């Protein structure tokens, strides 16, 4: 099975592990000082956390689902685990109509759980119906980008695989 890998720098590993355990409903596959990784089955994702680095920016992260029921189930699970969400919104944003919910991690990275329901000619956010009238959008947010660092450069990995 193939899966996307996402490597994030975090300021507080314990807070990040707690958040991502709740976000994806699973515990880390590996934990070391300053490091944790998750082998997430659904959606297929390898999430790697490095503590303490600086630099880089990130607009947002997301999970695209197959239907609105999956967005609703995710929002219910996130809320019941104590994470603050925007609620479920029918939204026009980023040239699409969507059903979505958003949550923000301990370092300010925005996560969107959504299903695309159609196309749109509009980039900026318009909430058609639903929860938070101040909901987030995937359109650029120039005023306060999330800053994520880069892992320090190291010698090339051996032919046996990468660093993670």
Please report, for each region that a protein language model flagged, where it lies by residue:
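N-terminal beta-strand motif that seeds the catalytic metal site of vicinal oxygen chelate
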Residues: 1-14, 44, 60-61, 120-164
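Core segments of cupin and vicinal oxygen chelate
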Residues: 1-46
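Residue-level recognition of strand-loop junctions within catalytic nucleotide-signaling folds
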Residues: 11, 50-52, 66
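Vicinal oxygen chelate
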Residues: 13, 62-110, 117-121
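Short acidic/glycine-enriched loop/turn segments that link adjacent beta-strands
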Residues: 32-35, 55-57, 94-99
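Short secondary-structure transition/capping segments
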Residues: 41-42, 97-101, 128-129
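Conserved beta-strand in the GNAT
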Residues: 46-50, 112
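A short, sequence-level motif marking secondary-structure junctions
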Residues: 51-55, 118
């Amino acid at each position: 099975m193939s899966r996307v890998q996402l490597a994030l720098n975090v300021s507080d590993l314990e807070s990040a592990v707690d958040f991502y355990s709740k976000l994806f409903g699973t515990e880390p596959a590996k934990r070391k000082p300053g490091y944790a990784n998750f082998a997430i089955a659904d959606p297929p994702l390898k999430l790697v956390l490095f503590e303490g680095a600086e630099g880089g920016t990130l607009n947002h992260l997301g999970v695209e689902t197959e239907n609105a029921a999956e967005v609703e189930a995710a929002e219910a699970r996130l809320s019941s685990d104590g994470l603050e969400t925007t609620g479920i919104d029918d939204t026009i944003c980023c040239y699409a109509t969507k059903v979505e919910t958003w949550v923000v991690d301990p370092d300010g990275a925005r996560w969107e759980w959504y299903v695309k329901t159609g196309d749109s000619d509009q980039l900026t956010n318009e909430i058609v119906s639903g929860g938070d009238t101040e909901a987030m959008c995937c359109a650029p947010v120039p005023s306060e980008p999330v800053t994520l660092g880069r892992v320090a450069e190291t010698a090339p990995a051996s032919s046996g695989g990468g660093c993670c």
